[in-house]
């Protein structure tokens, strides 16, 4: 853990510095100097901690995303100045953990940590799906607007997953997490996206803008995927963040319905093919019989006509 690597005294004030021993060898002094440099770098790293990556739970339920778009449009109808403050399509997510990854090697370590996280998450969920229901609107000091995660047992499970993720990444030596308490939320707008708003007199998100959605139920999202995303790299064409790696939660359970659907589809295709073949066979059989049937009919008509002629002659 990166914070544990710093001596505990560094967090509690300056430690007592032992007096230099004049008999200490030059090599020992150099080793001590290297260790002090290492501690200073660690302290500087903590001070300069600027998260640039995060773990994301993507929100893909159309009911939720459509509801958020309706909410955003409702707000913009009341105040068009907020257009640039809105979170774009495809970017809706829950931030599970933030972290700092400074180079490609650290990104690779982060990818490994995410892979190690998967069995821990599945153990927490005990083979069950985690449904995340969203209801109502909230803000962070009037600066960030978000859809609330409804109360329930799912919150405890998500908090445990977030804490496990933080521990897993820190044990890999990654600076991760925040000092503030983790509060899962689904951001739909933030004023920091549009700094010019302050000059236009917009200093906070007014509650009246979203009052009709204050208790609105947006829907449920199943936790099925966790992504390691970049805050700074160019977003994907669908609007979602640049993704370094992903894990799928309960992958086996999610694939079974797909396999079952494929089986059902295959059966329907086979049944349709058989039915079509039978119909084609019957049509061909009828076509072969039709010429003979036609001659017989004509003969019968001829006999009837002949009988009629004889009768006339009589």
Curated annotation (Swiss-Prot):
It holds the Pfam family AKAP7_NLS. GO terms for molecular function: nucleotide binding; protein kinase A regulatory subunit binding; protein kinase binding. Residues 261-285 are annotated as: RI-alpha-binding. InterPro entries: AKAP7-like_phosphoesterase, AKAP7_isoform_gamma, AKAP7_RI-RII-bd_dom, Cyclic_Pdiesterase. GO terms for biological process: cell surface receptor protein serine/threonine kinase signaling pathway; modulation of chemical synaptic transmission; protein localization. One of its GO terms (cellular component) is cytoplasm. Residues 24-37, 298-314 have a biased composition (Basic and acidic residues). It comes from the Eukaryota. It comes from Mus musculus. The lineage of its organism: Eukaryota, Metazoa, Chordata, Craniata, Vertebrata. Residues 1-46, 281-314 are annotated as: Disordered. This is A-kinase anchor protein 7 isoform gamma. Residues 262-275 are annotated as: RII-binding. Keywords: Cytoplasm, Nucleotide-binding, Nucleus. Probably targets cAMP-dependent protein kinase (PKA) to the cellular membrane or cytoskeletal structures. The membrane-associated form reduces epithelial sodium channel (ENaC) activity, whereas the free cytoplasmic form may negatively regulate ENaC channel feedback inhibition by intracellular sodium. Disulfide bonds: none annotated. Residues 260-314 are annotated as: PKA-RII-alpha subunit binding domain. Expressed in oocytes. Binds cAMP-dependent protein kinase (PKA). Interacts with PRKCA; only the cytoplasmic form is capable of interacting with PRKCA. It is found in: Nucleus; Cytoplasm. CMP binds at residues 95, 185-187. AMP binds at residues 95, 185-187. Its main location: nucleus.
